[in-house]
Amino acid sequence: MSGGQDLQLPPGFRFHPTDEELVMHYLCRRCAGLPIAVPIIAEIDLYKFDPWQLPRMALYGEKEWYFFSPRDRKYPNGSRPNRAAGSGYWKATGADKPVGSPKPVAIKKALVFYAGKAPKGEKTNWIMHEYRLADVDRSARKKNSLRLDDWVLCRIYNKKGGLEKPPAAAVAAAGMVSSGGGVQRKPMVGVNAAVSSPPEQKPVVAGPAFPDLAAYYDRPSDSMPRLHADSSCSEQVLSPEFACEVQSQPKISEWERTFATVGPINPAASILDPAGSGGLGGLGGGGSDPLLQDILMYWGKPF
């Protein structure tokens, strides 16, 4: 029972009307605007909802629920009803059944609800019996009006009994749950990949030390660049890509020309004669310099 607490019903009351009782005592009176003794049938636009939503909107019912509902046209100037409802549609099944004798007062139609889009919807167990008045002029009474019937009476039930969960097709169509709802993350490529994983930086390896001063001067000066680079970055890495400013060292040929102007070199004389009288008169007292002595000793060796 849903909403029955608002009704004043006697103990043991059960609402199981026949087709004739539904038509004569409820549908005919509602269409004529006459009062109904016990307003036990709710008035809603049934085609705005899925059938499993309807039980909680009913005023009374346990396994079947009753509603008054308007019915619209599918096309403005046609007589075909619009059967789309909620996340699916109602589809007629079987032949129409006249209600009333000897002359039919109403027509009973059975329909089955399909979840999803027509014509590939998923059949459900929800059934509707629709009662509409017979011999009613349903031509377009108003221009561009889609209303086909102001009121029809509908009985809704699930043939398996009770409340059945909505099918997967209806759930997906309603957007309640996304099938395969996991979000797939694609691997980062291109520029983003380069940003996320910086290229490997090779450590800068210093050249070998030259403890021998003669070996130092024997190396070409261009092979020993001095890097002068200022940067605002917090990290500076030596790389061949960076421009370098090279300060040249005196070349060996320059030393040879220098010593050629003073004649043969006598290393012993330069050491024994600190005053420079051993043939280095133009150099003054440079022979006493330790660095110069090492140079002279080197050039005094035979090649």
UniProtKB/Swiss-Prot annotation:
Annotated GO CC locations: nucleus
Domain spans labelled NAC: 9-159
Tissue/organ expression: Widely expressed.
First-listed, main subcellular location of the protein, grouped into a coarse class: nucleus
Any Pfam family: NAM
Inducing stimuli: Induced by drought stress, salt stress, cold stress and abscisic acid (ABA). Induced by methyl jasmonate. Induced by infection with the rice blast fungus Magnaporthe oryzae.
Record bears the keyword Transcription regulation: yes
Superkingdom of origin organism: Eukaryota
InterPro entries reported for this sequence: NAC-dom, NAC_dom_sf
Keyword Nucleus (UniProt): yes
GO biological process: positive regulation of DNA-templated transcription; positive regulation of response to salt stress; positive regulation of response to water deprivation; regulation of defense response to fungus; response to cold; root development
Localization of this protein: Nucleus
Knockout mutant characteristics: Increased root length in young seedlings.
Keywords assigned by UniProt, alphabetized: Activator, DNA-binding, Growth regulation, Nucleus, Stress response, Transcription, Transcription regulation
A molecular function GO annotation: sequence-specific DNA binding
Binding partners and assembly: Interacts with NAC071.
Domain comment quoted from the record: The NAC domain includes a DNA binding domain and a dimerization domain.
Other known facts: Plants overexpressing NAC048 exhibit growth retardation. Plants overexpressing NAC048 exhibit improved tolerance to drought stress. Plants overexpressing NAC048 show increased tolerance to salt stress. Plants overexpressing NAC048 exhibit increased tolerance to cold stress. Plants overexpressing NAC048 show increased resistance to rice blast fungus.
Function: Transcription activator that binds to the promoter of the stress response gene LEA19. Involved in tolerance to abiotic stresses. Transcription activator involved in response to abiotic and biotic stresses. Involved in drought and salt stress responses, and defense response to the rice blast fungus. Transcription activator involved tolerance to cold and salt stresses. Transcription activator involved in tolerance to drought stress.
Name assigned to this protein: NAC domain-containing protein 48
Origin species: Oryza sativa subsp. japonica
Gene: NAC048
